[in-house]
Amino acid sequence: MKTYSERANCVAEKIELLQKRRIRNRAILTSSCLVLAVVILAAVLFVPYDTSPPDVSMYRNSPYYGLIQRINAATYQKPRYKNNYEFLTTQMNNVKGEGFLNSGAAMDMAPGTAMPDEAPEMEVGTGTYEEVTDNQVAGVIESDILKRSDKYLFRLDKKVLKIYTIAKEDSALVGSVDVGSVDGMLNTTDLEMYLSQDCSTVTIISNCLSEVDKTAYVCVRSYDVTDPTNIQLSGSIFVTGSGISSRMVDGKLLLVSKFRIRSDKGFAEESSFLPQIGTPGNMTSVPADSILAPEELSSTQYTVITMLDAKDLEVSDSAAFLSYSDEIYVSREHIFATRSYADNQKLDGGRVLTKTMTEISAISYTSGTLEHVGSVMLEGSVKNQYAMDEFGGVLRVVTSTSEQTYTEYQGNGMVSVDDWRTNRNVNLYCVSMEDFSIIAGVRGFAPQGETAESVRFDGHMAYVCTAEVVVLTDPVYFFDLSKLPEISYKDTGTIEGYSSSLVNFGEGYLLGIGFNENRCLKIEIYEEAAEGVESVCSYELDATFSQEYKAYLIDRENWIIGLGIWPYSGGSQYLLLQFDGYELRDIGTTELQGSPDTMRAVIVEDWIYLFGDEFKAKGPIF
């Protein structure tokens, strides 16, 4: 029999053994938990994020399925970081003030990121049509806020259409109608209009927003003005999106608009990713075979072209172009739409070269249908419609080039850049309309750092004003394009200021409207000389002025230029100048209330009719 001491030792040994087992089991459990935690943590931190776009296979039977797939890929935003670990470490570095914040300017860079004669006059309606808008192309009429017949002046005064008689001092308002109200809609932009060739219909174009579902539309409405004292709404049509530009050609209204895809709405409703035409509640999508899209989208915005009958607003055809969403130029045969983007190239030593590129796509409209006929890729960007011109089967284009080089650094899920350098210049291209090949051109003809500020084509001639706006000096170039592929050119040399608009003024003269070295108004007359382009005379005034070309009165027959101004010394005025072959003379400055952008004027016989916030008839001016 064990003694008490032996029994006590035995119990102590058992307790010690149990404690060791507990410690071992606890260690095993702890180790297991740690291993499990590491596995879970690794799964949480290092498992890659899913970078696959959402599944859209449920729409495979849709005629738009191919387009849906491309839109889905273009609108899907991949995770910025590879996994949670990269996200957390980047956030910690940012908190500490490390990483890209101390590495120069940070930015995300993604390759491919977006950039005949006059119509015949007709003797019906409210008179004979008379053109008052200085259209870029003869017979391709542009919208404005002033139109006229031989009997009446049609003025779009903000949201009211007003009709005045042309009767010198007896001119008077004979009819008006509110055109700013659309049932259930809010107008979001200024309105513009057309007058039909028989002077019986005014067409109003505006952007509007539905008060019900906040859908944006381009609203086109026609008004019967046969009786100016009783103006009546005669029709309307809507296109989803917002307006870019429009033209009226031979009784057809060419409406150019843009529509942005609502990627947050998915593809269940066509209205979220397709432009539509009709009336609210009865809209029809542009057909799938009328939509042109590049294989890789650089934009989720359409340019939409709708061809309408100008009288009844019936749709003749429609087409949409994904990614073509910048400038619009319309010739007698084609609509040209531009798409600008950045072309990125990797160089040695971590350097990156980014060039601004522009794709110009041509759409034929003369057959009564809209048909894509080709496109061309050019270096640089197109400033506006006047930088493009189709003549004799050749598309002439002036672009402003921009090359940027920088060193790129990547780390912690961020992209940083340093040592940024920019080169700018101007190119002239001549493109064959047969195969869209470049058949002639002049590259980098301007002083380094300058861009094209104004361009004007006139038959075989081209005029280009380049400037470095910060310096405020400008050469004006004259190009002879009559013997392609040979191109010859002359320039004025350096002139103080620069022209924001160049205008053929007739009889070999060129009119420049722009700024002097003090950023005030400068109007200059140029002419071609044996050794270059010479300045004949200029007129300068300490005043601000409109840069809206449609606001200028250009009378080539009488060498008259008119525009609204706001002198620094007083209120708004309308300036009227005449060139006598030697100098520009003020022949009648008139006080006129309103913004220079919306001032308009027209000369009929020897009287001038002025429109601002008020109407004035003044004469005789000669």
Segments and roles (model prediction):
Residues E6, C10, V35-L41, S103-G104, ...:
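N-terminal cationic amphipathic segment used for targeting or macromolecule association
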Residues T51-F622:
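Beta-sheet-rich non-transmembrane sensory/scaffold domains
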Residues R7, V11-I15, S31-P53:
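Single-pass transmembrane signal-anchor helices and their membrane-water interface zones
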Residues I23-C33:
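Short secondary-structure junction/hinge motifs that connect adjacent elements
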